[in-house]
């Protein structure tokens, strides 16, 4: 929003306003954003929320594509995406805007291109967990832990642990496959209902116990998930040039977006899922951050955009 605010007045905030259309060089661009949003998300009424959900939509869509390409090695051996950045303040496919702000896509591309990446995929009534490697060496004695957790933080199935995994160089391999009803056999709700109340947390560790990759997987489209309402609490610690932000939510907060009114500010992470009871620390850096000066902060998550 801080980039849109550089070329459009708040009184004109509409997706099809004359100014917004002038800054959208695809004749079908804004309509296409809404079409895809209606498919996967609950479309917000507020303009600011529409912009935020549009960013989330772009990031998730591109991430799914990048992961599919990696998963289908050797038929696909690499991906370049359109586009990296912008030459002016505009609505576009870029992952970094004109002022150097990272969009959701840039964070999702960073995750999807991790050298070792966990990629679960549903096929009909089954779940297959892939390990994707772009490394040039084989990793041995890896451990993959998988937990199914509801949105309030309760584990709803026994954790699964795969030990002594080998991850060969430059490979895509399915290391775990199961039927969804077997995965959630201990739950009391019908399977179709339970899948809307939970997520899977997958963590890959090396032989020293260090986390190599972690993925949060949902079993349904975001618009179908029965996400809980929540308020994210946070604490800030500022010094010259940086702000340490610690976030906490009692229940799941999906697609958390942190924004400060500083063009080009860097975030150690953004557009992430904040897990129930998890304390997550984000480092914000900018030469404009000053110790002792209040830093205006916006923290938003998907559930807040529901009308």
List where the protein language model places each region:
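Conserved active-site loop/cleft motifs that coordinate metal ions or position small ligands
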Residues: 78-83, 257, 296-300
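Beta-strand-rich binding/interaction modules
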Residues: 127-166, 170-177, 198-205, 245-248, ...
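Intrinsically disordered, low-complexity Pro/Gly/Ser/Thr-rich segments with frequent PxxP/GP/PP motifs
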Residues: 144-193, 263-290
């Amino acid at each position: 929003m801080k980039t849109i605010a550089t070329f459009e007045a708040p009184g004109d905030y509409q997706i099809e306003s004359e100014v917004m259309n002038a800054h959208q060089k695809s004749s079908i661009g804004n309509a296409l954003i809404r079409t895809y949003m209606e498919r996967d998300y609950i479309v917000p009424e507020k303009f600011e929320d529409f912009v935020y959900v549009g960013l989330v939509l772009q990031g998730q869509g591109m991430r799914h594509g990048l992961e599919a390409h990696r998963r289908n090695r050797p038929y696909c051996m690499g991906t370049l995406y359109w586009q990296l950045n912008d030459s002016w303040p505009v609505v576009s496919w870029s992952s970094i805007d004109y002022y150097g702000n990272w969009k959701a896509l840039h964070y999702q591309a960073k995750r999807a291109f991790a050298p070792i990446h966990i990629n679960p995929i549903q096929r009909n009534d089954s779940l297959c967990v892939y390990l994707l490697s772009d490394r040039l060496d084989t990793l041995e004695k890896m451990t993959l832990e998988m937990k199914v957790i509801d949105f309030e933080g309760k584990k709803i199935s026994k954790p699964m642990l795969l030990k002594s995994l080998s991850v060969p160089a430059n490979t895509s391999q399915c290391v775990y496959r199961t039927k969804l009803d077997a995965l959630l056999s201990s739950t009391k709700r019908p399977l179709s209902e339970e899948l809307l109340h939970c997520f899977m947390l997958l963590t890959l560790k090396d032989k020293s116990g260090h986390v190599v990759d972690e993925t949060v997987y949902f079993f349904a489209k975001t618009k179908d998930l029965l996400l809980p309402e929540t308020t994210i609490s946070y604490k800030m610690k500022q010094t010259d040039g940086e702000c340490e932000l610690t976030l906490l939510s009692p229940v799941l907060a999906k697609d958390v977006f942190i924004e400060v009114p500083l063009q080009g500010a860097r975030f150690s992470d953004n557009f992430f899922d904040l897990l129930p009871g998890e304390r997550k620390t984000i480092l914000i850096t900018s030469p404009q951050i000053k110790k002792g000066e209040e830093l205006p902060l916006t923290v938003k998550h998907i559930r807040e955009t529901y009308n």
